[in-house]
């Protein structure tokens, strides 16, 4: 006898007639007049539960099996048999069943076998992994995570753990969470009356990071190809389906690379990850296609078979101005493209994923390499049909004099970035990288539109429960 996951049974990893133990939670119980109960038991290893066929000959049939309800945890031992019913190849003829945990009051169990709105489930984030939709999201999220790590490992990248606490603002936007151990009821003050951060834990102001990019650049300029994959934070007071205060970012950095190099890297990474989901998680994708967004499978298959289009920002603006469409936000050179502009380009004009390159410098960050025209920077966004921007990246500014000029233009203090400037003084090299918002990727793959439903415990304005 061996411990078996539900997925391993369905994959045929246990021979018909072999005895296995499956551990999980009851989704439903159905009793027949012939004295047999049918338990649908799931363990999270795959979308479908396994059917346990439980005869009334078991010693605990009357006093336990017939009292099982949704949410009870069980340990079932039995023989693997071919299932005569439709929908699954195998089931378990149960010879022994142990109840590991009961549901106190089945009538008030929040995850009883009924359909819940996705909004209601957010209020029960500790229980929502038990639902079909959130369980499927979790498996797809894991599959994408593993695929991304696998991709970079196979491409010779080194994973770098960048700090979550920082004194640098990568984006220069100022929307950062402050980290402090000062007594808020008795703040130390300087002679000028300002908060004296010299008395704080780090001896200066410190924040939760908005990006691991600047730190990753330092490692790329020694190890050639690196990436980060971890949480980032934005104190942006936006209560929308597209914003989180805490989210995960994938950020590769490559030495001796230009904008075209990382555009190619972005395409290869996305296709690798999507192929992994199509190969490994078709059961979950089928659920999403049936109950969330009927286009998800076709969209991913189309994505991986499409060549990425490329267009300069200036040409993209001209396309949008001449397309005959009236947009909610008018298009002019110098604006940041909105979601409606991005989606028109990807879905209607190019009908494929598209890389928009060379944006106006005034709408981009200080670290992006200034182009020869003096007006644009070597920045890019990857736009995907169905969602718009999914990746943002750039060639980094490797010239110290130009970097200092850009810092001054954006009213940023050179001294705050002394170590970042040092990299341009000691063997500087052209280098480039991008950032992928991981939750946006999960949302795109699953069709689950609200970003709060693709991360286990969402953090947003006035939302920090659990």
Swiss-Prot record:
The gene is asnS. PANTHER family: ASPARAGINE--TRNA LIGASE, MITOCHONDRIAL-RELATED (PTHR22594:SF34), ASPARTYL/LYSYL-TRNA SYNTHETASE (PTHR22594). It is found in: Cytoplasm. One of its GO terms (biological process) is asparaginyl-tRNA aminoacylation. The keyword Glycoprotein does not apply. GO terms for cellular component: cytoplasm. Belongs to the class-II aminoacyl-tRNA synthetase family. The lineage of its organism: Bacteria, Pseudomonadati, Pseudomonadota, Gammaproteobacteria, Alteromonadales. This is Asparagine--tRNA ligase. GO terms for molecular function: asparagine-tRNA ligase activity; ATP binding; nucleic acid binding. Coiled coil: none annotated.
């Amino acid at each position: 006898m061996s411990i078996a996951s539900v997925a391993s049974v369905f994959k045929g990893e246990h021979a018909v007639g072999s005895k296995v133990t499956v551990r999980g939670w009851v989704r439903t119980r159905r009793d027949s007049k012939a004295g047999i109960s049918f338990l649908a038991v799931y363990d999270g290893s795959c979308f479908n539960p396994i059917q346990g066929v439980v005869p009334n000959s078991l010693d605990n049939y009357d006093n336990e099996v017939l009292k099982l309800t949704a949410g009870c945890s069980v340990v079932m031992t039995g023989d693997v048999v071919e299932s005569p019913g439709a929908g699954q190849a195998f089931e378990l003829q149960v010879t022994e069943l142990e109840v590991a945990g009961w549901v106190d009051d089945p009538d008030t169990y929040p995850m009883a076998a009924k359909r819940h709105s996705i909004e209601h489930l957010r209020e029960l984030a500790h229980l929502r992994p038990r639902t079909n939709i959130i369980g499927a999201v979790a498996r797809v999220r894991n599959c994408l995570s593993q695929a991304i790590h696998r991709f970079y490992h196979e491409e010779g990248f080194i994973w770098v753990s960048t700090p979550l606490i920082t004194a640098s603002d990568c984006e220069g936007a100022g929307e950062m969470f402050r980290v402090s151990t000062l007594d808020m009821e008795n703040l130390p003050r300087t002679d000028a009356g300002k908060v004296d951060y010299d008395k704080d834990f780090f001896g200066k102001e410190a924040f939760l990071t908005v990006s691991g990019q600047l730190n990753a650049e330092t490692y790329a300029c020694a190890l050639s190809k690196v990436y980060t994959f971890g949480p980032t934070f934005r104190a942006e007071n936006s209560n929308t389906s597209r914003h989180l205060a805490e989210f995960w970012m994938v950020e590769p950095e490559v030495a001796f690379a230009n904008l075209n190099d990382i555009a190619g890297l972005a395409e290869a990474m996305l296709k690798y990850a999507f192929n992994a989901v199509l190969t490994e998680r078709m059961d979950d994708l089928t659920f999403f296609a049936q109950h969330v967004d009927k286009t998800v499978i076709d969209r991913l298959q189309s994505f991986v078979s499409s060549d990425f289009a490329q267009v300069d920002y200036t040409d993209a603006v001209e396309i949008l101005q001449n397309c005959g469409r009236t947009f909610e936000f008018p298009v002019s050179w110098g604006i940041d493209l909105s979601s409606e502009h991005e989606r028109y380009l990807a879905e209607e004009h190019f009908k494929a994923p598209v890389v928009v390159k060379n944006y106006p410098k005034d709408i981009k960050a200080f670290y992006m390499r200034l182009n020869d025209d003096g007006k644009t920077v070597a920045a890019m966004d990857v736009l995907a049909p169905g969602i718009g921007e999914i990746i943002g990246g750039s060639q980094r500014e490797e010239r110290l004099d130009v970097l200092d000029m850009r810092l001054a233009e954006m009213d940023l203090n050179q001294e705050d970035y002394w170590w970042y400037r040092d990299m341009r003084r000691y063997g500087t090299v052209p280098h480039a990288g991008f950032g992928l918002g991981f939750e946006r990727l999960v949302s795109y793959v699953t069709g689950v539109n609200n970003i709060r439903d693709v991360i286990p415990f969402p953090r947003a304005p006035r939302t920090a429960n659990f």
